[in-house]
Regions:
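Substrate-binding pocket helix/loop in short-chain dehydrogenase/reductase
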Residues: 99-101, 105-110, 121, 135
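Conserved glycine-rich Rossmann-like NAD(P)H-binding loop of the short-chain dehydrogenase/reductase
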Residues: 32-48
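The beta1-alpha1 cofactor-binding region of Rossmann-like NAD(H)/NADP(H)-dependent oxidoreductases
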Residues: 43-44, 62-73, 106
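Canonical Rossmann dinucleotide-binding motif of NAD(H)/NADP(H)-dependent dehydrogenases/reductases
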Residues: 3-35
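Residue(s) in the substrate-gating loop at a strand-loop-helix junction
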Residues: 143
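Active-site helix of classical SDR
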Residues: 124, 159
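SDR active-site lid
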Residues: 172, 176-243
Length: 273
């Protein structure tokens, strides 16, 4: 499947859109001529971000991705203003303070899974019928943490490994419809979230010191967003940045299903409306 996706005139929904990678993603999408639905639970930061953007091309929604009904309502309301959603970027996520499994607060573990995994499902599920009808595209933001074992971050790593599998399953399940899925794997992105975890926390800083260069190199949110939006346009099945992490990921064998999807052609005709 090699069809490209022209983002001009399309509607994209991005969660975690108030700052960091999410806000950079919004700007990239707007730059391609898309309309964008910005979703975040931080109302003040979201409104501040929205004030820097073209108000005619955005729809701003304050919602928590863990609230299933609220996310379904966002999809309904934004579709009434902008039309059906063509692209979904399930980006919202949190990183807990570093802790070993033995010392972890299991309630914190549950919270990470609720935001990172269930939040992604709550974002994607209400859009799926429209995505299939319009042969749209979904991005699930996983992480290099999904395939890199390490200490002090089991909750985050487990959540991102689960998100990866959601994305890979969706790609297989939607292949016959013409809708497509990208799984995004980021290494270290220079956001406040990363600084809190790796710079300001003693255990996180120690873990960071154990990583050799260039595995510990950080990329900017703008870079992560740019390579991801290019992946959307190409309908790429995965995007990995920094690229070195791709070699690490490639050590895992490709599934036979991946090869079948690469050759698949969509059934029926669902022209873009």
């Amino acid at each position: 499947m090699t069809r490209s996706l022209d983002l001009a005139g399309r509607t994209a929904l991005v969660t975690g859109a108030a700052q960091g990678i999410g806000l950079s993603m919004v700007r990239e999408l707007l730059g391609r001529g898309a309309r964008v639905v910005l979703v975040d639970r931080d109302e003040a930061t979201l409104k501040k971000a929205a004030g820097t953007l073209d108000s005619s091309a955005i729809f701003v929604a304050v919602a928590d991705v863990t609230d299933r009904d609220a996310m379904a309502d966002v999809v309904t309301r934004s579709s009434e203003d902008f039309g059906p959603i063509d692209v979904v970027v399930a980006n919202a996520g949190i990183t807990p303070p570093p802790a070993t499994i033995r010392t972890s607060n299991l309630a914190e573990f549950d919270r990470v899974m609720a935001v990172n995994l269930t939040g992604a499902l709550n974002t994607i599920h209400p859009t799926l019928d429209g995505i299939v009808e319009r042969r749209g595209h979904i991005v699930v933001v996983s992480s290099a943490a999904a395939f890199s074992p390490g200490l002090g971050g089991s909750a985050y790593m487990a959540s991102k490994a689960a998100v990866e599998q959601v994305g890979r399953a969706l790609r297989l399940e939607l292949a016959h419809t013409g809708a497509t899925v990208t799984v995004a794997y980021y290494g270290f992105v220079d956001t406040e979230l990363a600084r809190d975890t790796l710079d300001r926390d003693p255990l996180g800083a120690r873990v960071g010191e154990l990583l050799p260069w260039p595995m510990n190199r950080r990329v900017s949110p703008e870079h992560a967003a740019a390579v991801t939006v290019r992946a959307i346009e190409r309908r790429a099945p995965r995007v990995v940045t920094p690229r070195l992490w791709g070699a690490y990921s490639a050590s895992r064998d490709r599934e036979p299903g991946d090869r079948r999807v690469d050759r698949a052609e969509p059934h029926g005709a669902h022209p873009h409306r």
